[in-house]
Amino acid sequence: ELIQGSPALALSVIREANRQARSGMSEPAENLEVAITRLGLKRTEELLARLPTLPQLEIPPALRQLQLISQHASQQANGFFASRLARLWQDIHWGSLLFLSPLWPMALTSPQLLEEWERRVIHKGESARKVELQLFGVRLLEICQALVDLWRLPIWVEQGYRLLLNEQRELVKVLRI
């Protein structure tokens, strides 16, 4: 229950299970249940004990905001799709919860970069591509895609970033419908 309520803990457990699985080239753990099964309760407990904790007020607002958005996305996805696609509930839940997780480390270590991006792109209307190249040296979506691949996050997350990076015209067509 503790892990279910904390996106960062869930991400840590899934990443660790996928890191361990990479050497055996098995399929990535797509959800928390599979990750805990692979790690075992003892290793999961040891992992959680090693993770640093911060009081709520010391967590950068950018990270809190991204994690709240992630939790909200998961709740919305569950509300929209879980009853109709019950067999995919886990995929829907973890895919939507972890979609923004590649941004969490940056929000923790360099929140000012994301705040600057938000100020310039969202509020001032500057080109996202131009701002991202100035701030990060590469597109933000490319950073996210690289972390998704490295962490072996669920396929829905991977496909989402591929769509955003490579199929923008198709995405615009779909959204117009």
PLM region spans:
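Post-HEXXH active-site segment of zinc metalloproteases
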Residues: P111-H123
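Conserved alpha-helical "signature site"
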Residues: E1-L114, A128-R152, V157-I177
